[in-house]
Amino acid sequence: MLELHRVSKSFNGRTVLSDIHLTLENSRRTAIVGPSGSGKTTLLRLIAGFETPDTGVITLNGQTLCDNGFSVPAHQRRIGYVPQDGALFPHLCIADNIAFGLKGSKAEKQKRVDELMALVSLPTHLQKHSPHEISGGQQQRVALARALAQRPALMLLDEPFSALDTGLRAATRKAVMDVLQQANVASILVTHDQGEALSFADRVVVMREGQLSQSGSPWALYHQPNSEDIATFLGETLILNAQIDGGKADCLLGRIAVDRPTANGRVRIMLRPEQITIQDTEITSTAHMRATIRNVEFSGFVSTLTLRIHNAEADVIELKTVSHAAFIVGQQVSLSVNGAAHVFSQ
């Protein structure tokens, strides 16, 4: 269990982290997500022992790592660290990179290297290759194997997939998840990629301006964010004014269900694009609302539609939808809402 209590950090008089409270107990994979400058990498460096907090206490499995000026050195914390670029030693071969820091006889080290190469699914013939002779995805697997060599209690991943192209990023992320699960090592991933955080973790922590804004399961954060800022940060969204009465909300899209039917009065509600079905009016005659397409931005799998809602004065909305039909400007469409809209707390 990792615990942070009242942790703060400043650099040159500028506060980077402020009064951080965080407990990671049951979660095996945690993602800390936030925009650039939110303090997430600094938080990771404090946990790793590369920096010392100005105030606060950090403990791991009951051991105090830092408190009131006292700090356990990074190499004694049993914490693995994989940086963004892998940081492999260019003058060492793959096997020597993985074995770096291992104690024991040459045979014992080689046995451990063989085990780790198999664990991260790297062929044995790469052991004598130099880092520049293998792909970016393979380099990240070597960095992970090197971090696992010391049998850490916790693995820290500092945006390790950001330098990879899209297809390789997803494949490498899945491979890393599988390896960490097989090794039974808890992990914390720092990323600015919302989709990466939601798909990697079973607990997500959102950071904004040096503070923790919200934490919970990926599903809860995506569907029930605490604020409009978090809602828009975590994915495409449609936020509307609404009036709740009788357990339902009257809004631009008609009368729809909400996740807080006990709320009353004027509120702000949120829908995700996948909750809204868009169909040609010739296909269906039943819908909450009708609209005219004003603009279409096609980008392959997804199209962004600008819609003018009928019976509403100058109300125009933008929606992303799967490009299952060839939408055209001027087309009349019907809109229907699936599931409940999320009601923001006032």
Curated annotation (Swiss-Prot):
Phosphoprotein as UniProt keyword: no
Binding site for ATP: 34-41
Organism superkingdom: Bacteria
UniProt-recorded Gene Ontology molecular function terms: ABC-type ferric iron transporter activity; ATP binding; ATP hydrolysis activity
SMART domains: AAA
PROSITE patterns: ABC_TRANSPORTER_1, ABC_TRANSPORTER_2, FBPC
Enzyme superclass (EC): translocase
CDD domains reported for this sequence: ABC_Carb_Solutes_like
Disulfide bridge positions per record: none
Function according to Swiss-Prot or TrEMBL: Part of the ABC transporter complex FbpABC involved in Fe(3+) ions import. Responsible for energy coupling to the transport system.
Protein name according to UniProt: Fe(3+) ions import ATP-binding protein FbpC 2
